[in-house]
Amino acid sequence: MYYTYIIYSESYDIYYVGQTNNLEDRVNRHNGNRNKYTKGKGPWILVFSQKLDSRSEAVKLERKLKSFKNQYTLKAWINKNRGLEHPV
């Protein structure tokens, strides 16, 4: 199983989109400052995740979410899809 996920930093008011096969470990890595982009910008809160059958499906959704022009579009998508897998 793979996951596409969105985490949020309240202190910086930013979202990060990613995909992984181990969701809990990946979020812990973001909060442990072991990721270049998210380092020092936490704490990070998981606001959305969706379980997918393959990595290619997870990457496809990740790319779609990263293609949104701004965080407001991403936030609207999260609100529309809330409850799909992981509630905000």
Question: What kind of feature is each model-predicted range?
Answer:
Residues 1-36, 40-52, 56-66, 71-88:
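GIY-YIG nuclease catalytic motif and its immediate N-terminal context
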